[in-house]
Amino acid sequence: MQYDAVRLGIGLYGISPMGGDATLRPISTLKTIILQIHDVPADETVGYSRKGLLQRPSRIAALPIGYADGLNRHLGNRRGYCIINGKQAPYVGNICMDVCMVDVTDIECREGDSVEIFGPNLSVETVAAWLDTIPYEVLTAVSTRIKRVYYSD
């Protein structure tokens, strides 16, 4: 027998396959930008099938990422959020193929600002838990349409 090989699996990406703190540092971030911001009155709807009913006058930001890019449709309708300028921005309405909408009513932001889908402020494990799945699925769902940028220390 030979014992000189290791299968790193998801550990290569800084995520423990067993959960918990394994002193691994996650290495991946999925980001986009705010494409547009619109003020939308209360009782209006947002997204496919008009599922996102707004309870109050809201500022809604459109993000150029959708389920064709790997953003899971089940995150829509406030079941998940992204991070904008350090604040949680809930997804409103259904996640569309190429775009999604988030509520930025209480967030100071503007078009062009960076949006973290997952990364240092929102872990892949957290997103996976919202979806009742495993981190592998969240990471491998990211489409080849998404530009990859690699950094070296």
Model-found features: residue ranges?
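Active-site anion/phosphate-binding pocket segments in diverse small-molecule metabolic enzymes
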Residues: M1-D153
